From Swiss-Prot:
GO terms for molecular function: mediator complex binding; transcription coactivator activity; transcription coregulator activity. It comes from the Eukaryota. This is Mediator of RNA polymerase II transcription subunit 15. The modification Phosphoserine is found at S948. Component of the Mediator complex. Component of a med15-hrp1 subcomplex, which flexibly associates with the other Mediator components. One of its GO terms (cellular component) is chromatin. Its main location: nucleus. It comes from Schizosaccharomyces pombe (strain 972 / ATCC 24843). Belongs to the Mediator complex subunit 15 family. Keywords: Nucleus, Phosphoprotein. The keyword Phosphoprotein applies.
Length: 1063
C-alpha cells in the first residue's frame, strides 16, 4: 500500500542519479572482491540499488540505505588492510635489517651492460617521486607511506655506493645466457629479482588497484591495452615501473596539449588582428571612393549651391572669430581640408535622411524594409547588390543630394529676404528705443544673421539625430570642443526639420511689452470668456519639470511671452494671475502650501479603503462609461484646481473632500479599462456636479483677485487679505439681527407669536437683492424679546404664561399646511408604499430618538392642535422649529418627502436593533467620503512631485474641452453672480429641543468660513442627501465621544433608498 501511495518521490529521482549511486557501490565491491569481473559487480550493485529504491518509502530512506551500505563496505576494506599490514610488518623490518646480505651479482652484471646501466641511472631520480605518487594513488595508510619512503632512501644510498665501487674495466658475460640485454632485463623483471630495488610488500587489493590504474593510463595515453590476467601475473616491481612510465607519458602529453592550445590562441589573436586591419583598410578605401565622385560634384566651395549648403550643414567648422567679426567669411575659399570635411559631413547626414519612395522604386530587387541610404550602404558592404545596381544607386544618390541642396538654398534665400525686409523697416520699437543701424552694410548683417541661424539649426539637428555625439561648446560660445559626428547617428525627420526652420524664418520678432502696456491693453469690462479660455494652457514658466520652475521670476515669463502676438495680451494677463498666485502660494507661502497639500493627499490615501467591485446591470454600466467620458476633461485638471482652491481659501476640510472625489473618480477610471465598476452612477453624477461647483467657485475668486490686482493695483497678498476681510464682514452682517421692517412683516403674518416669528429667516426669493444665507447655518435664537426700546430675558415665566394660542392663529396654520400639501406632494411623485404611508401618519405616536425626528406637515398640524393654553419655554422653542419647517416645506416639498422616507427607514432600524435583530439593509457610510477626525496628519515621505505647480499645470492635450463644466470655459455672468452659490437652510438636524439647537448653531457659526464653505463643506449641503448622512454621522460621533448613551443604537439609512426617490 505504501508503495502505491508514495510514488511521487520516485519520480523526482533522475536515472543518472540512480546510476551514479550503483556505480559507487560497484567500485567499492571491486576493492573487496578483485577476482570477480566488472559485469558481475555492476549487476550486484544494480540489484542492491533496485531493492533499496523499491523498498524505501521516501527519498531520504532510499539515500540512507545506499549510504549505509557504502559505509559498511568501506569499513570492511579498512579492517582488511589493517590486518594485512600487521601480518607483514615483521617480515618487512627483517628484510630492511638484512640489506647488506642481498646478492650483488645482479648489480655487477647490470653494471657491465652498457645499455641497461644508463637507464638505471636515469631512473634513480624519478624512482622516489614515483613511489610517492604510487603511495598517494593507492590510498595507503601513513605507516605504509613511511615504509615506502624508507625503502626509497635505502635504495638511493645503495645505488650511490655501487657507483663508487665500480671498477673501470669489467669482464663481459657471454651472450649465450641472454641473447640481448633487454631480454635479460625483461627476464630479471619477470622473475622479480631486479637487483638494487626493494619491492614493497603489497596486498592483493593494492595490486588490483594498481592494475586498474595501469589499464586506465594505457587507455588515456593511446597505448595498446594489456589483459588484466597478464597484469595480475606480473611481479609488483614490473607493475610499478609500467605505472611510472605511463605517468610520465601522460604528463608529457598534457604538456604538449597545453602548448598546442597556447599556440592556437596566439594564432587566433593574430588572425583577429589581421581581420581588423583589413576591415580598417576596406573602410578607408570605401570612404575614399565615396569622396571621389562627391568632390567632383563639389569642386569648389566658392559660390555654388553645394558650398552654401555644406556651410549650412556644418556650422561647427566655422572659426570662433565669425561672431566677433561678421565681415569675414566662414572659411578660407581655397582650403581643401575644409572642403573634404564638409563633404564627409554632408555624406554622413545624407545617410540618415529618409529617401522618397519614388527613388527607391527605380532600383530593382531592393528589399522592402530599406528606407534610408544607410540601409543601402549596409547591403553594398555585405555584397548583396550587383555592380549594375551600384551604378544606378550612385546616380540616384547624386540626384537626391542635388534636390536636397536646392531645397535648402531656397529656404536660405527666404531667410535672407526676410532679414532684408526687416532692415528696411523703421529702426525704432514700441518703446522708442533706437535699434542699431545695419543698413549701411546689409551684406555683413545678412552674413552674421545667416551664420547665427545656421548655428542654431545645426545644433538642434545634431541634438535630435545623436544626443551622445553633440558638440560641447565652451562657455564663451565660440569654437566647439568636439566636432565629430557619430556614423551611427539616429534617423532624423528631415521634413519636420524644414517645416520648423521655415516657420522660425517667417515668424516676425515681436518687441517686448512692458507691464504698463500689459495692463493698459486690458478691456475695461474684463472679458472673462477670452481671459480664462486662453488660460486653459499652462503658463510657460511652469512647463518645466520639477520644482525648479518655481524659482523662475515673472520677468522671464514676460520675456518668453514677448514673442507671441499682441492679441493674446488679455489671455496672458489672466494666466499671469494664476501664475502669480501659485508662485506666492496664497497667504501661507508656496513651499508651505505645497507641503500641506502633500500631507493632505497622504492623509486621504492612508484613510481610504479599496472599494469592493459592484455587480451592476448593463444600463448602469453604460451610464458610468458615459459619465466618465464627459467628466474626464474636468477631472484631468483637478490637480491645478486643488492648488488654486487651497491658495484662495485655505479650507482643508473642503480640500480633503476634493482629493477624495478625485481619487474615487481615478479608481473608477482605472477599473473601467478592466471592466470593474466600483462606483454607482448616482454617486459618480454627484461627484461630477460637486466638482463643477468647485471649479465655478475658483473662477469667481480668480475674477475677483484679477480685478483687485489689475484695477486697484494691489499685490497678490494684499488682494487676498482684502478679499478675506470682505468675507469676514459678510459673515458678521449675516449674524446681525434682521431689520425692523422684516420683523414687522413677520409679525403681521404671525401676530400671536412674536418671539417665534422674529427669528424665522425669510425665503431667499422673498427679498430682492438679499444676500442668501449659508446652507446648514441657522441664525442664533434671540436671547431677549424686544418690546419698544426695552428688552427682557426669555426665561421670564410670567411673560410666557400670559401668551396663549387663539383660534385665528390655528386657522392660519391650517391654511399654511393645506398650501404645503397643495404645492406638489403627490403620491405618484413620492412613490411610497402603503405600509410606509401608514407609518408616516402614525409618526407622531412613535417614540423616536433625538436629532433624528423629521417634522412633516402632518406632524406639524398635530403638534399645533395640541398646544395647551399655558405655554412653556420648551413649547415655544418647539413652535419656533415648526414655523421654520413650514416655510421650508413650502419652498422645497420634495426634500420633506425624502426626509420622511429617511425617518421611516430610521424607525425600522431602531425597532430592529431593539428587538436584537440587525437588518441587512443597514449600510455604513463609505470610508471614501468620511475621514475620522482622529486621523493624524501623516508626513510626506514619498519623493513624488505630482502636486507641484509645474506638474499641476501640465496638460495632456488628448481631449477637446467642450464640456460646460470645463475649468475656464465660458463665464457668462459677472463677478457678483459667480460668488456665493448659497443654498437652502439645512433642516435635517433640527431637533425638538430648542436650547440644544441654539448651542449647535452657534458652534457652527464660529466654525464655518465665508462662501466657499457654503457649497464645499461636506456637512452643510441640504440638496445632497449623502452629505446629510455624513453630518448625522459626525453628530453621532461627537455624542459618542461625550458619552451619550441614549443614541447608541442609532443606525443610518441606506443611500440606495434615497437615490431611488431622487431619480
Amino acid at each position: 500500500m505504501n508503495r502505491n501511495v508514495d510514488k511521487g518521490w520516485q519520480a523526482q529521482i533522475r536515472p543518472n542519479e540512480r546510476q551514479s549511486i550503483a556505480l559507487q557501490i560497484a567500485q567499492t565491491l571491486r576493492i573487496i572482491s578483485p577476482s570477480i569481473s566488472e559485469v558481475q559487480l555492476m549487476n550486484m550493485a544494480l540489484s542492491f540499488e533496485r531493492q533499496a529504491f523499491d523498498g524505501a518509502s521516501s527519498k531520504n530512506e532510499y539515500l540512507t540505505t545506499c549510504g549505509k551500505k557504502t559505509a559498511q563496505l568501506r569499513d570492511q576494506i579498512r579492517d582488511t588492510l589493517q590486518a594485512t599490514q600487521m601480518k607483514q610488518m615483521p617480515s618487512v623490518y627483517n628484510n630492511a635489517g638484512n640489506v647488506g646480505a642481498l646478492p650483488t651479482a645482479g648489480p655487477n652484471r647490470l653494471a657491465n651492460n652498457p645499455r641497461v646501466m644508463p637507464r638505471l641511472q636515469n631512473q634513480n631520480v624519478p624512482m622516489q617521486a614515483g613511489m610517492q605518487q604510487f603511495a598517494r594513488n593507492m590510498k595507503l595508510t601513513p605507516q605504509q607511506r613511511q615504509f615506502l619512503l624508507q625503502q626509497s632512501q635505502i635504495q638511493q644510498q645503495r645505488q650511490q655506493q655501487q657507483q663508487q665501487s665500480q671498477q673501470p674495466q669489467q669482464t663481459q658475460q657471454p651472450q649465450a645466457s641472454s641473447p640481448t640485454a633487454p631480454n635479460t632485463e625483461a627476464n630479471q623483471q619477470r622473475s622479480g629479482s631486479v637487483p638494487g630495488r626493494i619491492v614493497p610488500a603489497l596486498t592483493q587489493q593494492q595490486l588490483n588497484n594498481l592494475c586498474n590504474q595501469i589499464t586506465a593510463l594505457l587507455a588515456r595515453n593511446g597505448n595498446p591495452p594489456i589483459p588484466m590476467q597478464k597484469l595480475q601475473s606480473m611481479p609488483p616491481a614490473r607493475l610499478i615501473s609500467i605505472y611510472q612510465n605511463q605517468i610520465q607519458k601522460f604528463r608529457s602529453l598534457q604538456h604538449m596539449q597545453q602548448q598546442q592550445q597556447q599556440q592556437q590562441q596566439q594564432q587566433q589573436q593574430q588572425q583577429q588582428q589581421q581581420q581588423q586591419q583589413q576591415q580598417q583598410q576596406q573602410q578607408q578605401q570605401q570612404q575614399q571612393q565615396k569622396q571621389a565622385p562627391q568632390n567632383a560634384f563639389f569642386p569648389n566651395p566658392q559660390g555654388n549651391v553645394g558650398a552654401q549648403s555644406l556651410q549650412s550643414m556644418s556650422p561647427q567648422d566655422q572659426p570662433s572669430t565669425q561672431q566677433q567679426q561678421p565681415q569675414r567669411t566662414a572659411a578660407p575659399p581655397n582650403n581643401p581640408n575644409v572642403n573634404a570635411t564638409n563633404n564627409n559631413r554632408i555624406n554622413i547626414e545624407m545617410l540618415n535622411i529618409p529617401v522618397p519612395k519614388q527613388l527607391f522604386d527605380q532600383i530593382p530587387n531592393l528589399p522592402p524594409n530599406v528606407k534610408i541610404w544607410r540601409d543601402v550602404l549596409e547591403l553594398g558592404q555585405s555584397q548583396r547588390l550587383p555592380p549594375e545596381q551600384l551604378k544606378l544607386i550612385g546616380m540616384l544618390y547624386r540626384k537626391h543630394l542635388q534636390i536636397i541642396l536646392q531645397h535648402r538654398q531656397q529656404q536660405l534665400n527666404k531667410i535672407q529676404n526676410a532679414r532684408m525686409n526687416s532692415q528696411n523697416a523703421p529702426n525704432t520699437n514700441k518703446l522708442g528705443n533706437p535699434q542699431p543701424d545695419n543698413t549701411g552694410n546689409p551684406q555683413a548683417f545678412s552674413q552674421q544673421a545667416f551664420a547665427q541661424q545656421q548655428q542654431q539649426q545645426q545644433q538642434q539637428l545634431h541634438r535630435t539625430s545623436n544626443p551622445t555625439s553633440a558638440s560641447v561648446t565652451s562657455q564663451n560660445g565660440q569654437q566647439p570642443i568636439n566636432t565629430k559626428l557619430s556614423a551611427n547617428a539616429a534617423k532624423t525627420n528631415y521634413q519636420s526639420y524644414l517645416t520648423n526652420k521655415a516657420r522660425n524664418a517667417t515668424q516676425p520678432t515681436q518687441p517686448p511689452v512692458s507691464q504698463v502696456d500689459y495692463s493698459n491693453n486690458l478691456p475695461p469690462n474684463l472679458d472673462t470668456s477670452s481671459t480664462f479660455r486662453s488660460s486653459a494652457s499652462p503658463p510657460s514658466a511652469f512647463t518645466k519639470a520639477g520644482n525648479e520652475a518655481l524659482s523662475v521670476p515673472l520677468s522671464g515669463a514676460r520675456n518668453t511671452a514677448a514673442s507671441r502676438p499682441t492679441n493674446l495680451a488679455a489671455g496672458n494677463s489672466s494666466a499671469s494671475i494664476v501664475q502669480q498666485l501659485l508662485e506666492c502660494g496664497g497667504t501661507m507661502g508656496q513651499q508651505k502650501m505645497t507641503s500641506r497639500i502633500r500631507e493632505l493627499t497622504e492623509r486621504v490615501m492612508h484613510s481610504l479603503m479599496r472599494p469592493v467591485p459592484l455587480d451592476l446591470p448593463h444600463d448602469q454600466k453604460v451610464m458610468i462609461a458615459s459619465l466618465i467620458k464627459s467628466a474626464y476633461p474636468m477631472f484631468s485638471r483637478t490637480n491645478q484646481l486643488i492648488c488654486l482652491f487651497y491658495c484662495l481659501t485655505g479650507n482643508e476640510e473642503a480640500t480633503i473632500q476634493l482629493i477624495q472625489m478625485r481619487h474615487i473618480f481615478k479608481l473608477q477610471l482605472e477599473g473601467l479599462q478592466q471592466g470593474v465598476f466600483t462606483c454607482a452612477p448616482q454617486t459618480l453624477a454627484k461627484i461630477k456636479e460637486k466638482t463643477s461647483r468647485y471649479f465655478a467657485f475658483v473662477k469667481a475668486q480668480l475674477l475677483r483677485l484679477h480685478h483687485e490686482v489689475n484695477n486697484n493695483n494691489m499685490s497678490i497678498q494684499n488682494a487676498l487679505a482684502h478679499i478675506s476681510s470682505l468675507r469676514t464682514a459678510s459673515i458678521n452682517q449675516q449674524q446681525q439681527p434682521q431689520p425692523q421692517s422684516q420683523q414687522q412683516q413677520q409679525a403681521s403674518q404671525f401676530p400671536q407669536a412674536p418671539s417665534v416669528s422674529s427669528n424665522v429667516r425669510p425665503i431667499n426669493g422673498s427679498i430682492p437683492n438679499a444676500q442668501p444665507s449659508v446652507p446648514g447655518q441657522a441664525q442664533p435664537a434671540a436671547k431677549a424679546n424686544s418690546v419698544g426700546n426695552t428688552s427682557f430675558p426669555v426665561d421670564s415665566k410670567l411673560a410666557f404664561q400670559s401668551l396663549d394660542v387663539s383660534q385665528p392663529d390655528l386657522q392660519a396654520k391650517q391654511k399654511i399646511a393645506s398650501q404645503v400639501m397643495k404645492h406638489g406632494l403627490k403620491p405618484e411623485d413620492l412613490k411610497l408604499p402603503p405600509s410606509k404611508k401608514k407609518k408616516i401618519e402614525n409618526l407622531s405616536t412613535v417614540q423616536k430618538p433625538k436629532d433624528s425626528v423629521v417634522n412633516t406637515p402632518d406632524v406639524i398640524m398635530s403638534s399645533v392642535d395640541e398646544i395647551p393654553s399655558s405655554v412653556s419655554p420648551g413649547t415655544i422653542a418647539k413652535e419656533e422649529g415648526m414655523a421654520k419647517a413650514r416655510e421650508e416645506a413650502i419652498a422645497n416639498p420634495l426634500k420633506y418627502a425624502i426626509d420622511a422616507f429617511v425617518a421611516v427607514d430610521h424607525e425600522e432600524e431602531v425597532s430592529a436593533i431593539k428587538s436584537s435583530q440587525t437588518p441587512s439593509s443597514i449600510l455604513k457610510t463609505p470610508q471614501s467620503f468620511f475621514i475620522p477626525p482622529s486621523t493624524p496628519d501623516l508626513s510626506f515621505t514619498d519623493n513624488k512631485n505630482s502636486l507641484s505647480p509645474s506638474n499641476i499645470l501640465s496638460l495632456d492635450g488628448k481631449f477637446s474641452f467642450n464640456d460646460d463644466s470645463e475649468l475656464w470655459a465660458d463665464l457668462g455672468n459677472e463677478i457678483n453672480s459667480e460668488i456665493g452659490f448659497l443654498k437652502e437652510p439645512d433642516t435635517m438636524n433640527l431637533a425638538l429641543d430648542a436650547d440644544k439647537d441654539k448651542t449647535k448653531m452657534q458652534n457652527k457659526l464660529t466654525q464655518i468660513n465665508f462662501d466657499e464653505s457654503c457649497f464645499l463643506d461636506p456637512a452643510i449641503d441640504d440638496k445632497d442627501p449623502w452629505n446629510e448622512m455624513l453630518h448625522e454621522k459626525k453628530v453621532l460621533l461627537k455624542q459618542l465621544q461625550v458619552g451619550n448613551e441614549d443614541e447608541d443604537n442609532i443606525a443610518f439609512p441606506t443611500s440606495t433608498n434615497i437615490w431611488q426617490v431622487v431619480i
